[in-house]
Amino acid sequence: QKTGLLVGLQLAPVDDLTQYDELIDAGADHFSFCFEFMSDFAFSKYCPGKARTLGQSAFFRAMEYTSGKLGKGRVSGEIIAGVEPIEETMKAIDRITDCGAFPTICVFRPLEGSDMAVYPSPFYEEMREVFKYMIDRLIEKRIPIGIAPNVEVSLVVQPTDALYLADNDMNTLLYRAYNKALTSLVKPFFNRRLKRGDRRMEQRAS
């Protein structure tokens, strides 16, 4: 509130969903929930702590609830592509977008010195298929992306990057126009918010 910047929170799901209301009232603009894998096998094998203490369903409950409170496109579900079969990743995309959230897809990269250092990197063709599927579902379900200004990350492929894979048809054109209209509509809000933050910071400095 003092800076005017947008606030995004990456959280583990909780049983008491009303706790998210408190965060929204405090000024949270975005929620992100990382459940990583769709298949029970991969989720249990690679995320044993989450599987044991939380379970997958808790992540979807949290996404559905917070998306219902904030609106479409302001909640994300994070998944890792390239470890489990892409059919499972596509199921995850369906579940996330059914919640009104957008998928944040991290492509698996084997890191030297890690437990999965020798695990093979995913094929480009399969990852392209995954991102094409993601943008198709976002277009189909009219989940807006890229509305907030100046959001740049290097670790993941942003949903907006997948627009290059979308079909050049009327649905895509309408979706692009929809996102553009929303961006224009909320731009004054973001500008006012940042200006208020600038004034507060100047007052504190003086």
Label each PLM-derived region with a short phrase.
Residues 1-119, 126:
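Conserved AdoMet/S-adenosylmethionine-binding subsite of the radical SAM
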Residues 69, 86-206:
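Auxiliary Fe-S-binding modules of radical SAM enzymes
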